[in-house]
Amino acid sequence: MPPQPRKRFGQHWLKNEKVLHRILAAAEVTKGDRILEIGPGTGILTRWLTSLADAVVAVEIDRDLCQQLRRQFEAVEQFLLLEGDILQLDLAASLSQQPDFWPLNKVVANIPYYITAPILEKLLGRVAQPNPQPFDQIVLLIQREVADRLYAQPGSKIFGALSVRVQYLAGCELICPVPAKAFQPPPKVESAVVRLRPRPFLPAAINPPLFEQLVQLGFSSRRKMLRNNLQDLIDREQLISLLTSLKVLPTARAEDLSVEQWVRLSNKIQEMRGNDG
């Protein structure tokens, strides 16, 4: 009996060929690519990736699926399976002695929705500590609600701290929505394919930890104005003066500022602290 999807691993296996081809087209897979696939499941996407790329490294936590994948791809030289938790795995340590599979330059994955945020941090890093070996691009099948937040624009009610942090590190675009019926079993939510292109040159936050703290505080109470949310970090009148210099209204809320404005505000606060010191 073939392995069945396990709820505890958040497994929903893609069965729609049209969506599969949209993912492959978005990833722009060519010879020369070395692909990381997270959660290959039954190998439906893996088969295509191994036919198009020079190398595919699949990370799977489910032991039963690993046994099936080893049998299925044992004759495929460009395929390597790593059994384990992607969040705990040190890819560089695991692959650095295998030049045919390292370094990896793209990610293509249908990931478990309940660990989307940790996986994004694993792949992109954080503002204060970006991935030192960024991927060329990352194509993910994720929950639609999260996808919308990733590429949301300033002024939108869903533009939040996650939007700012991810857009600081990467460009993000929606490729296509994916209905629940495209999976086995169907999830209780709608899904979407997104493409992230990590930025080769990051926005110049002088003090990245301060930037992260500022964004987190700014969005801590969405209904409040920034001058209230940030009062523990900076004097209210000083903040109003800084916002005015950035051509931002004193009544602005966190979602009103673009990523660039968040960077400039962070830098001005850092400069002010330096001058005070």
Residue ranges of model-derived segments:
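Short helix-coil junctions and helix-kink-helix linkers
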Residues: 231-233
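Catalytic cores of RNA-modifying enzymes
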Residues: 1-216, 244, 255, 264, ...
